[in-house]
């Protein structure tokens, strides 16, 4: 999957709606942990950065949240980001499990999607279209990926090819649903007063 292009398209759709403070949230290892990012996460971060650069938006390192596999740590980092001076008006989650953590934190802080903040996530998990509002997602061509891998494997097993493995980049598709609005419509990631100091 062309993760760079997919992330770039998602962030460009947000900047096109006026968002200037966009956070990327991932469950990849954080700074200080083993600094190993799988290629798909690295490509998504690179696409995010390139889209901000193309929109002439300064890249703010604190808007890239690498929470590691500990969901409590990830949630704590998102909470801290939501009360920081550089609060996001939109989030890009690198997968649907990260989106679930984001949804929990935003609900806990009494923030509404898309009224207060916008959210786009990678992966068109079944639940993403079943919630209210349904999430805007980056759908990966799972069937096409499986077909391409199977065809390559069968050709190798039959001895039809001795060429080195090839890399095939398949496009992902941005499916716009109800979780994105213009930044001027929302107040951003500002907790309601009843939750401040709780």
Swiss-Prot record:
The record ties this protein, via CDD domains, to: PBP1_LacI_sugar_binding-like
Q: Which UniProt keywords apply?
A: DNA-binding, Plasmid, Repressor, Transcription, Transcription regulation
Asked whether the UniProt record includes Transcription among its keywords, one would answer: yes
Q: Which InterPro entries match?
A: LacI/GalR-like_sensor, Peripla_BP_I
Q: Name one GO molecular function term.
A: transcription cis-regulatory region binding
Question: What Pfam families would the database entry show?
Answer: Peripla_BP_3
Q: Which domain of life is it from?
A: Bacteria
Keyword Transcription listed? The answer is yes
* Biological pathway: Opine metabolism; mannopine biosynthesis [regulation]
Per its UniProt record, what SUPFAM superfamilies does this chain match?
Periplasmic binding protein-like I
- Please give the function described in this protein's UniProt entry: Possible repressor for genes for mannityl-opine utilization and / or plasmid conjugative transfer.
PANTHER family in alphabetical order = HTH-TYPE TRANSCRIPTIONAL REPRESSOR PURR-RELATED, LACI-RELATED TRANSCRIPTIONAL REPRESSOR
* Protein name from the UniProt record: Probable opine utilization operon repressor
Give the gene name: opnR
